[in-house]
């Protein structure tokens, strides 16, 4: 019989119960025990959903209060020493302080989990790091699953991926040298799981899909030789890309099974068809929301079943934490666009799709004929739908003039024209875009959407907030202002709602980091901007002040990356469609007198393919799409872009090729680490490295901000340096926001006086 299993499940709950409970706990409105009880109830629901879908194992250990890599730092005793916490006796408050910072320490750095929109907390390894096992996180969840009578499979990220994802801190050394100390701690953790009755243990090694150095690849042999001594069957799970180049190594490892992502990299199956152990085929897309064509999947699985017999397992391609919880609650979408609804599949539907595949493999296709027919009908309808393809979009892309994505003049000429009218001081200060979104603002937006607030009352509320934001910025003496984005629920969703070719869910939330969830748009068809989207708000804000007002757009690559994207045409084509649509908005802003326009691209690096060999092609089309979004603007219009959550030292030439007049970047959490690259690569345009971390409510000291600014001045000419926070301030409160910005402006004025 074919075995089915799940690699991981969404953590936040069907209705984001965990998010709201966490935030109440942080505000001291919820007792710790109540938070723990809610989390336990969520885990039970998750496991019961998996069991109801006939999964042979439920995944345990994947649930987390913030991040599974943070949990692993605790489990291995690798929490940053600078906090002074004892990993063996860590309180829940201390756990959250690691993630969010406290009055004495900034939060652990956060970055993207491979090429997804999930963020993990980056382990800080030091030469003196002393690992110590604390398996309580996993053991406690196993005990809960056992108490429910469930067959379970613990899930833990493997030691090589864990080390690879971290960074060296302090005295120079190579974190790879810590491996021999780390492996015995893993053995101790795994033994604790075995003692609780674990027969199979899933060890995730997604780093194998990267371009790992030879010594790291070779280390898999010795590491798994040690781990395999544990009295359990190990399932080595890979995902997000092909591991075919490591096929001989993986087939020789002393593990009981191997999981392959056959959605992202179906071609790799050929390299493993002679695998002699359990082969887990990841055939249901774990990162997107499109319904599978189950007949096509079975065309792949049935020959595999004939070869492998009971050694064939089936699963989603990766953890389902990247997909929304349940399509069935999307009643409005079903009523509004029945066809699109029939093409979608969320977490609960995906585990049921897996169940259909399992029944078909075990009992024949006829046993699930109705489900297969429904799947086929949806696939056929989508392939021929006229809702998806709009000829005028393809025609416009095909007929773009040569050089459409290039500015009229080089930066050196543009900046002279821009400076002539901007007349800004040295080290100009600005905000990245959003200001705090109060309960009142969110309520007004929600009431308007529900039809409970008239358009006139809604616009009055937004204008009142915009004026408040403008006045606060004037009081702080910021140089280039923003309107604050009160009208925007999300930087991608807002634009998607105003562009044709996008659809929206009501409950399609996925975790971004900690309690932060996002509701990605669904790009299902060709993209067009039917009318202006932001012009009236920026125009109104500009009418309130004599200072420069910055227009705010989200760039094409970020809209693409932070959406669930159609999979029937290349992503590059979708991205260029969005870029061209945005260019209409940019020209309308320019015509309305908004001559500083920011086109945010925080997600440009996360779109990089995992293999470097594929980078150039991606960077070429991503850069073209970005430049297309401002095609046709005049030289004296200043185009800004913003990037966050990223490391771009290795793609600086591509970032420079975007040719934005000003780039602002997130750097404070990594102590301006990005700027070390500027010693070799002289970024040609203006740059604003973030001088404080907006992910924490902590107000930075003047000394800290000055330290970062002086580091920046060491590598960036003062004439080209801007001063700004790391990112937008949407998630912060007003009190801390004012205090944080005041420190930033005061320090800037001090340095201006020095440099004058």
From Swiss-Prot:
Residues that bind Zn(2+): 642, 644, 666, 727
- Where, by residue number, does 5-methyltetrahydropteroyltri-L-glutamate bind? 16-19, 112, 516-517, 562, 606
Q: In which pathway does it act?
A: Amino-acid biosynthesis; L-methionine biosynthesis via de novo pathway; L-methionine from L-homocysteine (MetE route): step 1/1
Instruction: Extract the SUPFAM superfamilies matched here.
Output: UROD/MetE-like (SSF51726)
What protein name applies here? 5-methyltetrahydropteroyltriglutamate--homocysteine methyltransferase
Gene assigned in the entry? metE
- UniProt keyword list: Amino-acid biosynthesis, Metal-binding, Methionine biosynthesis, Methyltransferase, Repeat, Transferase, Zinc
> So what family is this one in?
Belongs to the vitamin-B12 independent methionine synthase family.
Give the EC number.
2.1.1.14
Q: What is the active site of this protein? A: 695
Q: Which cofactor does it need?
A: Zn(2+)
Organism name: Haemophilus influenzae (strain PittGG)
* Cofactor: binding comment: Binds 1 zinc ion per subunit.
Q: What does this protein do?
A: Catalyzes the transfer of a methyl group from 5-methyltetrahydrofolate to homocysteine resulting in methionine formation.
Q: What GO molecular function annotations does the UniProt record carry, in alphabetical order?
A: 5-methyltetrahydropteroyltriglutamate-homocysteine S-methyltransferase activity; zinc ion binding
The record's Gene3D superfamilies line, in alphabetical order, gives: 3.20.20.210
